[in-house]
Amino acid sequence: WMRIRDVIVEGYADHDGFVVLHGTDTMSYTAAALSYLIQDSPKPIVLTGSQKPMGNPFTDAKLNLYQSLLYALDEHSHDVSIVFGGVAIAGTRARKQRTMSFNAFISVNYPPIAYIRNDRIVRNGLHGMHQGENPVRFYDNIDPRVFVLKLTPGVNPGILDALADSYDAVILETFGIGGIPEFGESGESFQEAIFRWVDS
């Protein structure tokens, strides 16, 4: 992430936009990281890749690259996004959902920025033009001491205390729309552990 960020920053003044070719398995992680490392960019930073390699006769690489360039050249494109399978998705909202299909990525809890059909970019209207109110901001570090914990039924609440020595923060991936264990001895222990994190 930092190397990609550095290359973009080094060439930012000399280019109108950027297209980054990337493997699909970790592309959404890179897009999210770049979205926080490079904020309020009036220039587009587009990530793309393919499900099948360029040499495959049925590859999606050429179309994805073409559509990414088309999107990056559009005057209304800005910030970090993924263009893949005819869809432009905000960098902070993309998730790889399918491992075989050409429409591999979905936009989580937010509509796609745009669809690309027959050389036309059809925008959803919610992700407007860059207003230019804030200059682009570059950040040069990411705290590696952040842990993402996916809660599962029966999770041992002691895991939060075990993580406290090695991490500065824990992001809880909770049930449904934010539910955490509440009842019984396990629920109480879990909530106490959360309060210890909040108070520290």
Segments the model singles out, each with a brief description of its role:
Residues 1-10:
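ATP/NTP phosphate-donor binding region
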Residues 13-17, 40-44, 75-79, 84-85, ...:
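Short coil/turn connectors at secondary-structure junctions
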Residues 20-22, 46-49, 81-85, 150, ...:
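Short beta-strand segments
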